[in-house]
Amino acid sequence: MSKRGRGGTAGGKFRISLGLPVGAVMNCADNTGAKNLYVIAVHGIRGRLNRLPAAGVGDMFVATVKKGKPELRKKVMPAVVIRQRKPFRRRDGVFIYFEDNAGVIVNNKGEMKGSAITGPVAKECADLWPRIASNASSIA
């Protein structure tokens, strides 16, 4: 029995290593007032029994704010991963990783809630999310 869905995608997103499972806490790299983001669920993950869904660079996930402004805390909101510590392979064969895990809060359309991003944004994320790329100070 062959595995289904293992072929390459036309355009789309290149498969990268997933470094942030459900329950992970990462830095919030925008100026919304949130200090960190807690991963609740990952968009588009079908899953398998007993396997934790995980997010990688460029993935949208459902998050809550654990530290930050009181008006942001105790609410469920979408966010996007912009950096991860786990090394992932680019198309040109080079492995890249960042010094922290970070995400930004967005709305359902992918538009940022904040207006600035601290630190670099992965190229993979910038290609998928143009509104995040326009607010990025540097793209790595």
Swiss-Prot record:
Residue ranges the record marks as coiled coil: none
Gene Ontology annotations for the cellular component aspect, listed alphabetically: cytosolic large ribosomal subunit; cytosolic ribosome
PROSITE patterns: RIBOSOMAL_L14
Sample GO molecular function, one term: myosin binding
Top-rank taxon, per record: Eukaryota
Family annotation (Gene3D superfamilies): Ribosomal protein L14
UniProt-listed GO biological process terms: cytoplasmic translation
Keywords: Ribonucleoprotein, Ribosomal protein
InterPro entries named in the record: Ribosomal_uL14 (IPR000218), Ribosomal_uL14_CS (IPR019972), Ribosomal_uL14_sf (IPR036853)
Family under the similarity heading: Belongs to the universal ribosomal protein uL14 family.
Protein name: Large ribosomal subunit protein uL14
Source organism of the structure: Drosophila melanogaster
